[in-house]
Structure formats: C-alpha cells, structure tokens
C-alpha cells in the first residue's frame, strides 16, 4: 500500500444514475497516468449518498479496472457502529485489496473502544484494514499512543491519516510506526508527509492530475518540492467548497467524466471556484499534466 492512490468520484448521468462508463474511463485514466492504486466508495465517491445497488455497480467497475491493470483497490467500508461496519466489510471484502474503515464518528467512543472496533471489523474479514483517522470530521481525536496501538493490530496494514496538518501526534506516529503504511489523506500535505516517512497518499486531486501526484511522490527533494508547490494552489481550490463539487466540475471540464452532478445536500459549485481550480491545473509544469 505504497505510493499514490486516487480517491475516485462517483460520476452521475444527467438522469441522476451512476455513470459506469465515466467511472471506468476516469479509473483507467488515473492508472494509465502513474497512480499506484484506486480508492472506491470513499467520501469523495459520495458513498453515503448511493443506494446499495449503486455501490455494487461502483465496486464492480473499479474492481475490473484495477484487476486489469494489476493495481490495488481500496474500498470504503465503515460507519459509526461496529456491527454495521462489520456488515459493510463483509459485503465489500470480495472486491477489495484493503478496506478503508473510518474511526467511529459523532459518538466519540473511548480510545480503548476505538481499538476494539477495528479489531472486531478486522476479525470479520480476510482482507487487511486501513483505519481512516480524520478527527476534524469524526469529532474523535486520537493520541499517538492510540494510533500506534491500532497500527500494531495484525488485521491492520496501515492507516489513512488526515490530521489537517502535521502535529506532534503525527510526527510521533511516523517516527514509531511498526512497519505499517501510513497514507496521507490531506492532499495538500502529501509531500511533506512523504518526506517525514509516510508510505504514500490517498488523493482526490489525483483524479484530475494523476501524473503530477505520481511524479511528486517519486521525485527527489528538489523535484518533489517543486511539484508540491505547483499542486498546492490546485488542491486548495478543489477543496474551496464542499467536496467533491469543484473536483467533479473540473473533471467534467477536462473531459474525464461526462457530467459534474453531485447529490443533495451537496450543491453545484460557484463558477469562480471552478475557474480558479482549472487555472491552477493548467499552470502545472509541462509534463505534469
């Protein structure tokens, strides 16, 4: 689970159905342009807004593209409850090389209960877990000690870590991680996290600029930093409104999906936000597009 993994949007048709053809085209484009793997049914994919039948369509399309390229597929499977997370994990394990399971949100369980949650989900399936730590969304912050306890579980292959910055707990975890793959999930922080020892990143922005993110991850200190600095304005613009609205609009403008639609309660982005993001995209260095 190293390198850059593109967190895929779920395209919709103008009639509001899942656009399997656009999803296949986007997934294939990402892999053909250097990303190491794909992520399906994450937050970027509006997984919570899909029906069970639509989620299965997404999984089938992404599995076929990933297997055809020999690339790993990470699949989102987790919610606030342990029993429901186990159910989702069992339903989706057959499609996945790893399951992305969020820290239980809103309830703010104890640290011990969070560790037990991941142990229970991991015991229910035969594929490894990537716990998803995103405290500014879940409302549950975990100290480095607990993050390392989670990483030490046999069922855990690594972690998607989104702290919204690089804090002391992040530094401690990276310095002490027991041979597990820490993947940065904050697109703007992937490069500095890589330099500090992260194994890679899970990036929504890599849907639009897969070559640039792949090159940034492979680059040495000078080249990687140059690409990071070039990508930062694009990442900031793509997240300037609730995601993935701006990203989908840019993907449609770039011809990578057919329609930019998002589902309620998300709304179409302001044209100015899309223009800013596209300008940053087109300003990327030659060879990075």
Model-derived regions: residue spans:
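Generic structural "secondary-structure junction" signal
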Residues: 6, 10-14, 51-52, 136, ...
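Structured C-terminal cap/extension of enzyme domains
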Residues: 31, 192-289
């Amino acid at each position: 689970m190293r390198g850059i993994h593109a967190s895929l949007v779920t395209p919709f048709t103008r009639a509001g159905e899942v656009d399997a053809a656009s999803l296949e085209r986007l997934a294939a484009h990402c892999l053909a342009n250097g990303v190491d793997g794909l992520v399906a049914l994450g937050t970027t994919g509006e997984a919570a807004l899909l029906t069970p039948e639509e989620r299965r369509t997404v999984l089938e399309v992404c599995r076929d593209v990933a297997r055809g390229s020999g690339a790993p597929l990470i699949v989102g499977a987790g919610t606030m409850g342990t029993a429901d997370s186990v159910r989702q994990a069992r339903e989706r394990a057959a499609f996945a090389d790893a399951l992305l399971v969020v820290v239980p949100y809103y309830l703010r369980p104890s640290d011990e209960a969070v560790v037990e949650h991941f142990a229970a989900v991991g015991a229910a399936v035969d594929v490894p877990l990537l716990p998803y730590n995103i405290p500014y969304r879940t409302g549950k912050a975990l100290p480095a000690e607990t993050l390392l306890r989670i990483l030490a579980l046999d069922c855990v292959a690594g972690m998607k870590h989104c702290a919204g910055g690089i804090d002391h707990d992040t530094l401690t975890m990276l310095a002490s991680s027991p041979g597990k793959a820490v993947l940065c999930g904050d697109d703007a922080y992937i490069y500095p996290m890589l330099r500090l020892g992260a194994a890679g990143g899970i990036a929504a922005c890599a849907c639009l600029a897969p070559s640039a993110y792949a090159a940034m991850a492979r680059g040495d200190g000078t080249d990687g930093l140059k690409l990071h600095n070039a990508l930062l304005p694009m990442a900031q613009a793509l997240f300037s409104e609730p995601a993935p609205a701006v990203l989908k609009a840019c993907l449609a403008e770039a011809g990578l999906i057919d329609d930019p639609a998002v589902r309620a309660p998300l709304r179409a982005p302001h044209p100015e936000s899309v223009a800013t993001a596209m300008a940053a995209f087109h300003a990327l260095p030659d060879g990075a597009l």
